[in-house]
């Protein structure tokens, strides 16, 4: 219910549906509107965001767990420095590769960035492919029990004896929803998930979240999920991986090893890095190059399927088919929607 009464003009033109909908009018008067843009890896999120920002006077907030790290540029498809100079970007290059960065850190950094952008009468545009991070932004940071050294030691022993895949299979049985959102090689997240289940008797996906100001309450969130045609996306992933190698991904990985990426399990296991770290560790054998590249492409493709699964859970994200549309055309659709609510 609105806290006041209005007489609504029901003869307004179809374009002005804000005039006909009390909820939309309430949002328009009392909430600031922000834009959330996601989509699978290789769907063109970056190009769309760069086209969209000037249309709505926006600044971009990265929703990516690896783009926060300095030096992880090519493998994360980080937006160019030139583009960042033209359009302000937030949450990029804010950590050294050895420093930890988790979903709680992201939540508070992202909220702070949005407040800063809005204080200057600009529009926050959150862009990325991490469903877990978007969920934290909308719902608040996760609240879980403290780590239990004994349980962790037991789980580490299982991983040592039977491999991380055994732990992942266990997590898949106990909490398939959460397991689908992480990679089967991410030992830290797998162990943390099993630890929470063992300590609380509840699935991670069912766990309570901290009672803090939530973006979904504070702002009117207009959220979009880019949905390219499957064959197009597959081809794009292949070309993207090839381009990264041509741009110097292997040299980037060598540099990160020198900077201590092994000290950061999350960064060390990131797709596009773990495959080539293994290749370098095995002596850079020429006969293993093509197989490593195949794994790189395959892992990237499988991750896109996890992303789609995650975002299907959230009705706030509206699917936007992109077949036959340029980045500008997609941006115009989103800008038109934003202007209706702002």
UniProtKB/Swiss-Prot annotation:
Molecular function GO labels: ATP binding; tRNA dimethylallyltransferase activity
Region (Interaction with substrate tRNA): 64-67
Binding site for ATP: 39-46
Entry keyword annotation includes Transmembrane helix: no
Site feature (Interaction with substrate tRNA) residues: 130, 152
Residues the entry annotates as binding substrate: 41-46
Signal peptide: none
Pfam family, any one: IPPT
The keyword Nucleotidyltransferase appears for this protein: no
Family recorded in the similarity comment: Belongs to the IPP transferase family.
HAMAP family reported for this sequence: IPP_trans
Function statement: Catalyzes the transfer of a dimethylallyl group onto the adenine at position 37 in tRNAs that read codons beginning with uridine, leading to the formation of N6-(dimethylallyl)adenosine (i(6)A).
PANTHER family: TRNA DIMETHYLALLYLTRANSFERASE (PTHR11088:SF60)
Protein's name in the database: tRNA dimethylallyltransferase
Organism this protein belongs to: Chlamydia pneumoniae (Chlamydophila pneumoniae)
Gene designation: miaA
């Amino acid at each position: 219910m609105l806290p006041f009464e209005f007489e609504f003009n029901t003869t307004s033109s179809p374009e002005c549906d804000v005039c006909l909908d009390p909820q939309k009018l309430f949002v328009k008067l009392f909430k600031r509107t922000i834009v959330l843009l996601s989509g699978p890896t290789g769907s063109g999120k970056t190009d769309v965001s760069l086209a969209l920002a000037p249309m709505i006077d926006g600044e971009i907030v990265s929703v990516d767990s690896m783009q926060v790290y300095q030096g992880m540029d090519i493998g994360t498809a980080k937006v160019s420095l030139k583009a960042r100079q033209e359009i302000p970007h937030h949450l990029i290059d804010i950590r050294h590769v050895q420093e930890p960065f988790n979903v709680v850190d992201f939540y508070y950094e992202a909220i702070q960035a949005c407040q800063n952008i809005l204080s200057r009468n600009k529009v926050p545009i959150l862009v990325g492919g991490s469903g877990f991070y978007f969920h934290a932004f909308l719902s608040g940071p996760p609240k879980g029990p403290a780590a239990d050294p004994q349980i962790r030691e037991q789980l580490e022993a299982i991983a040592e004896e039977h491999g991380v895949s055994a732990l992942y299979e266990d997590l898949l049985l106990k909490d398939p929803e959460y397991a689908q959102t992480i990679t089967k090689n991410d030992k830290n997240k797998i162990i943390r998930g099993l630890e929470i289940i063992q300590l609380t008797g509840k699935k991670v996906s069912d766990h309570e979240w901290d009672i803090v100001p939530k973006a979904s309450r504070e702002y009117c969130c207009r959220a979009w999920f880019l949905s390219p045609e499957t064959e197009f996306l597959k081809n794009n992933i292949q070309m993207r991986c090839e381009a990264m190698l041509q741009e110097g991904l292997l040299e980037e990985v060598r540099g990160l090893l020198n900077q201590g990426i092994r000290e950061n399990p999350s960064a060390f296991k990131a797709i596009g890095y773990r495959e080539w770290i293994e290749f370098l560790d095995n002596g850079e054998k020429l006969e293993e190059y093509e197989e490593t590249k195949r794994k790189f492409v395959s892992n990237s493709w499988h991750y896109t399927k996890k992303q789609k699964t995650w975002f299907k859970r959230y009705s706030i994200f509206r699917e936007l088919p992109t077949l036959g549309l340029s980045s500008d055309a997609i941006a115009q659709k989103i800008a038109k929607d934003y202007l209706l609510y702002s």
